[in-house]
Amino acid sequence: MKHLLSILILFGSISQASYASQPIIEKIDEINANVIFMRHALAPGFGDPINFNLQDCKSQRNLNDAGIEQAQNVGQFFLKNKIIFTEILSSEWCRCIDTALEMNIGASSTFEGLNSFFQGHVNKSDVIKKLNIKLDNLSSKSLILMITHQVVIAEITSISPPSGGIILYNSKNKTAKEFKITDYDQNF
């Protein structure tokens, strides 16, 4: 009987520890999020250089070493918490594509509806229209990661995340909630 009690206590502790280490799942469930918006990882600077060319990464603001590490850490956080995405989409900007690659959590594809309209390189209304069509047609049972820019996330959610920041979003009722990994994972 003593061993049975010890085993029950042990399993109870393991179960509680596992559950406590996955607050992102609780937060996703709270709002029935089917989208996780992520701002691209750290890419020092502001906007893009004057010679910006979407087809040339050298003409863009790119991830630095800290940004690469940040993207890898976010990817590890998702893996550790067993977050599986039905789709991973990225802006066509190199810093967003590279964020997806460095996260190493699955294949990603680019989507024009996530491109930055900050400096007028693309038309804001075209981007938001494409994104809204995509969001309106998502299944409530899916979970899609969208790696994009501060201006796009703020336009949809009214929240401005930092580099590498995560916003949970329910595309059906338009509920958004910021999730700060640093509040839950001491490795950040």
Please report, for each region that a protein language model flagged, where it lies by residue.
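Short, surface-exposed amphipathic charged segments that create phosphate/polyanion-binding patches used
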Residues: 122-129
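...with weaker cross-activation on analogous glycine-rich loops/strands in unrelated enzymes
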Residues: 134-137
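Active-site-proximal alpha-helix that buttresses catalytic centers in soluble enzyme cores
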Residues: 21-120, 139, 159-188
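Sec/Tat signal peptide C-region and signal peptidase I cleavage site
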Residues: 14-20
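Sec-dependent N-terminal signal peptides
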Residues: 4-14
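Short, well-ordered beta-to-alpha junction loops that form the rim of enzyme active sites
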Residues: 90-93, 147-151
